[in-house]
C-alpha cells in the first residue's frame, strides 16, 4: 500500500487531448512521456490519468471494456510502462482513475452475464420487469432517461446509473469484489 501525503499536487491528464507523441493526430502516452520534465517543473508531485483502459468510447473512456490493459490508441502497455518509469525517475507518482461502479456493455463480464454464464450471471444488477411491462423501479439515470434497460438476450432489465452502455456492477456479489481486488493488485 502507498499512503500519499495530502499536500501533494497532481496534474490530471486525459491523454487524448494532451500531446500527440506518435504523430497520428491524437494525444497519447508517448506525448505524456515527452512532457514529464515540464510537468515536474510546474511543481507537480505526480500525474493522475483519466481512464486510459480499452473502451468503446461511449463516455470518454469511463465505459471500461478491460481493466487490465491500456488502450492501443494511447500506446498500450509499453507506453504506460515508459511513462511510469519516467515518472518514478523524476520522483513523481502516478494515479490511475479506476471506475468500478460500472463497466462497458462490451466488457467480457457483461457479455457473459447477459448469457447467464457462471460465475458471471450475477456480476451486474439484473431485475425482471413489473407486471404490464413496467420497469423494476422509477429511478432515473444521471445521464439519460431511466436507469433500466431491457436486454433481449437475458430477458431482464439491467441497471445503469450512468449511460445505457455502462451497466452497473453488482458490488453485493463477493465474486465481483474479488475481481476488483484482482484489478487493484494488477496495477
Question: Each predicted region: which residue ranges?
Answer:
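Acidic/aromatic-lined carbohydrate-recognition and catalytic surfaces
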Residues: 3-181, 185
Amino acid at each position: 500500500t502507498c499512503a500519499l501525503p495530502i499536500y501533494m499536487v497532481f496534474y490530471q491528464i486525459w491523454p487524448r487531448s494532451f500531446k500527440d507523441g506518435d504523430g497520428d493526430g491524437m494525444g497519447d502516452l508517448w506525448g505524456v512521456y515527452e512532457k514529464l520534465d515540464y510537468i515536474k517543473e510546474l511543481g507537480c508531485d505526480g500525474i493522475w490519468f483519466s481512464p486510459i483502459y480499452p473502451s468503446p468510447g461511449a463516455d470518454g473512456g469511463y465505459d471500461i471494456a478491460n481493466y487490465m490493459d491500456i488502450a492501443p490508441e494511447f500506446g498500450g502497455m509499453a507506453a504506460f510502462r515508459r511513462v511510469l518509469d519516467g515518472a518514478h525517475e523524476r520522483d513523481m507518482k502516478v494515479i490511475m482513475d479506476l471506475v468500478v461502479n460500472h463497466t462497458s456493455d462490451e466488457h467480457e463480464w457483461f457479455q457473459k452475464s447477459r448469457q447467464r454464464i457462471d460465475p458471471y450471471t450475477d456480476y451486474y444488477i439484473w431485475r425482471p420487469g413489473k407486471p404490464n411491462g413496467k420497469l423494476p423501479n422509477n429511478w432515473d439515470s444521471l445521464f439519460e432517461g431511466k436507469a433500466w434497460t431491457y436486454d433481449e438476450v437475458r430477458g431482464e432489465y439491467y441497471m445503469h446509473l450512468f449511460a445505457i452502455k455502462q451497466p452497473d456492477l453488482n458490488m453485493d456479489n463477493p465474486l465481483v469484489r474479488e475481481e476488483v481486488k484482482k484489478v487493484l493488485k494488477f496495477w
